[in-house]
């Protein structure tokens, strides 16, 4: 007889000890080329040990001809699917199979390959047809699933299609989704009010109409379920395919920015040029995100490019008018760049003009061959001797602060105020990134600059 949903859920609770309903399950029966049966579940919530266990393990129990052989059999699934719970029963293994021999057993390898493919298909089905449920899955297990991009070359493309990120378009997507939901709710309320106002004399007609509407709604629901929903609109999360579909016609790369949190990357000065040009940027805020895109390298033949790369090139057709125009006083900027290279030699690797900044005075970018701050932090967690990258300081020559520094330099190259401003350019960017080197020095510097600014304001008022 057919197994009911209640029976599947009861078995899951017995197997896992989890009293919540699972998000999904897959019942597999395979006869060729080997014979095995499996029931696997995707839980609703992540257990604590999933990320913090000293030795990660796969929670799949192995049976042979219905005889228990081993629990937590790591050979049955790749570790990035360790959130899956389940049981496998195989008829093509001997009852006396040794645990030590499972790793290189061709039967086990085939089971692993088949199960992995079916689980990924189940997750993909959820992402296409049940975006709300997929959001729950992603919040619980997304950080673990990402490991598959680097660790499972065979299924890398499949896993990459399941990745989700926030992006510079996320806020708009979330607003659009909320607006659609509000419109839908309002329409439903209006429809209910209209139905309530219909006279009893027309009840039969209303009932017939309601039946027809219900049938149409059911057809529409079926159609909606069969049509893949590529974006988890609820929280503005986007897939890589979403990004590709929205990209400019001549855009050949996927832009991303990495940082500790969404607020930090949104406030990055480097985002200015992309907002002006209406170019979408992925936000990589999980510690493993940059490792993931470096492993993936490309999606749909488009390379991943960090927006803090020094040699970044933007599409020609969307360059802003006036951004690359020569400034009025080239000599002033050249002199300032030369001065800053000397004054900040211990803090930055290079100083140059920027052709991407529009509102901010400066930004720090990663030189060719260097690693981002997020990746550097990750590397230094495992190796404290990992060398720190000296980033390049880019100046916006049209910003008043930079122009004024150039004028101060022309008047007095040895000005103490100019030296303070020079170092504050670097500190300004670090503050925006949530990192402060030598807080006491920065506090003293800010106090001096406050005094200078107030004195200048008084002089201007009395003049």
Language model regions located:
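Conserved GHKL (Bergerat-fold) ATPase module
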Residues: 1-463
């Amino acid at each position: 007889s057919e197994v009911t949903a209640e029976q599947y859920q009861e078995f899951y609770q017995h197997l896992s000890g989890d009293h919540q309903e699972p998000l999904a399950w897959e019942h597999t029966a395979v006869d060729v080329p080997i014979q095995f049966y499996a029931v696997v579940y995707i839980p609703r919530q992540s257990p604590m040990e999933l990320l913090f266990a000293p030795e990660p393990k796969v929670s799949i129990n192995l049976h042979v001809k219905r005889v228990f052989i081993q629990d937590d059999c790591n050979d049955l699934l790749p570790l990035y699917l360790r959130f899956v719970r389940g049981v496998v029963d195989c008829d093509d293994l001997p009852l006396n199979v040794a645990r030590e021999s499972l790793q290189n057993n061709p039967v086990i390898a085939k089971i692993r390959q088949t199960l992995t493919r079916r689980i990924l298909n189940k997750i993909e089905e959820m992402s296409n047809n049940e975006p709300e449920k997929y959001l729950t899955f992603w919040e619980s297990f997304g950080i673990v699933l990402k490991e598959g991009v680097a660790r499972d070359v065979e299924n890398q493309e499949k896993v990459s299609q399941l990745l989700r990120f926030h992006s510079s378009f996320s806020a708009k997507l979330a607003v659009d989704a909320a607006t659609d939901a509000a419109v839908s709710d309002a329409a439903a309320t209006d429809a209910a009010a209209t139905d309530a106002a219909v006279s009893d004399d027309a009840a039969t007609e209303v009932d017939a109409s309601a039946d027809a509407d219900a049938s149409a709604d059911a057809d529409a629901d079926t159609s909606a379920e069969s049509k893949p929903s590529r974006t988890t609109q609820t929280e503005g999360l986007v897939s890589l395919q979403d990004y590709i579909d929205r990209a400019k016609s001549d855009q050949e790369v996927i832009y991303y920015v990495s940082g500790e949190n969404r607020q930090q990357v949104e406030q990055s000065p480097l985002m200015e040029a992309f907002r002006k040009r209406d170019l979408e940027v992925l936000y990589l805020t999980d510690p493993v995100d940059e490792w993931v895109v470096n492993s993936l390298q490309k999606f749909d033949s488009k390379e991943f490019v960090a927006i803090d790369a020094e040699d970044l090139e933007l599409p020609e057709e969307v360059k802003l008018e006036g951004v690359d125009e020569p400034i009025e006083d080239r000599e002033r900027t050249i002199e300032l760049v030369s001065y800053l290279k000397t004054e900040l030699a211990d803090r930055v690797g290079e100083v140059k003009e920027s052709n991407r900044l529009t509102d901010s005075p400066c930004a720090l970018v990663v030189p060719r061959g260097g690693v981002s701050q997020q990746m550097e932090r990750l590397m230094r967690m495992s190796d404290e001797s990992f060398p720190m990258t000296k980033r390049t300081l880019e100046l916006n020559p049209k910003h008043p602060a930079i122009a004024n520094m150039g004028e101060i330099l022309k008047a007095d190259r040895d000005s103490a105020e100019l030296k303070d401003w020079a170092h504050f350019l670097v500190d300004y960017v670090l503050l925006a990134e949530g990192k402060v080197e030598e807080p006491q020095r920065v506090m003293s510097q800010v106090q001096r600059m406050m005094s200078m600014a107030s004195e200048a304001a008084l002089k201007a008022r009395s003049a």
